[in-house]
Every structure is written in C-alpha cells, then in structure tokens.
C-alpha cells in the first residue's frame, strides 16, 4: 500500500477501526467476521444516518447474534440491514460477553457518496 492510497485523516469520518484504510473487500469482511466468531465474541450490527453518525448512538439491527458460528448468517443479516436502510452506515461489532465491551468494530457498508 502506498501513502497515496491512504485518505487524508483530516477530511474523512473516522468511525471505526479501519477508517484510514481503503474499503474492505467482501473477502476481507468475511475474514473479519470469522475473526470475531473465533474470538468467542457475539456479532451485532448497528446502523445510523451519515449526518448523525459521529454524535449519536447508533441503532442496533435486531439483537446481537449470540452463539452464531456461521459467517454466512452474519453476511445475510448485513445484507438485510443494507436493504432496510440503504442510506445508513452499517457497522459490525464484535461484542465480548466476558469483558462486556466491544472487542472489535468496523463499518461494513457506506451509502453512495460517503
């Protein structure tokens, strides 16, 4: 990766772990889902309008996917959330039940123009 591929940190939203990198590919998102599941964390989806993303709590899509071991189930929920909220940012969270905090989170969908 060259320095020209990294966005200017002063002119973009930094909403998640990978904000300064190019958007993740579908395979990279899949790998991150596998990582969350392998850590024993519960995947959960959050969504919010881009204009409110940095100063509001994000709404949760359904409930966290407690006990999910299949990354394809998580991908299906991401797609369902995207279809229901096509103009919202969608973030995947890996919730750690033991420490009761987020172990990982990143944006999996940005609407056009973001």
From Swiss-Prot:
Keywords: Bacterial microcompartment, Calvin cycle, Carbon dioxide fixation, Carboxysome. Induction: Induced by growth in low levels of dissolved inorganic carbon (at protein level). The keyword Endoplasmic reticulum does not apply. Signal peptide: none annotated. SUPFAM superfamilies: RuBisCO, small subunit. GO terms for cellular component: carboxysome. Optimum pH is 8.0. It is found in: Carboxysome. GO terms for biological process: reductive pentose-phosphate cycle. GO terms for molecular function: ribulose-bisphosphate carboxylase activity. CDD domains: RuBisCO_small (cd03527). Heterohexadecamer of 8 large and 8 small subunits. Forms a CsoS2-CsoS1-RuBisCO complex. RuBisCO catalyzes two reactions: the carboxylation of D-ribulose 1,5-bisphosphate, the primary event in carbon dioxide fixation, as well as the oxidative fragmentation of the pentose substrate. Both reactions occur simultaneously and in competition at the same active site. Although the small subunit is not catalytic it is essential for maximal activity. Replacing the endogenous type I ccbLS genes in H.neapolitanus with this carboxysomally targeted enzyme reconstitutes RuBisCO with about 25% of normal activity; the active enzyme is targeted to carboxysomes. Belongs to the RuBisCO small chain family. Encoded in a cso-type operon. This is Ribulose bisphosphate carboxylase small subunit 2.
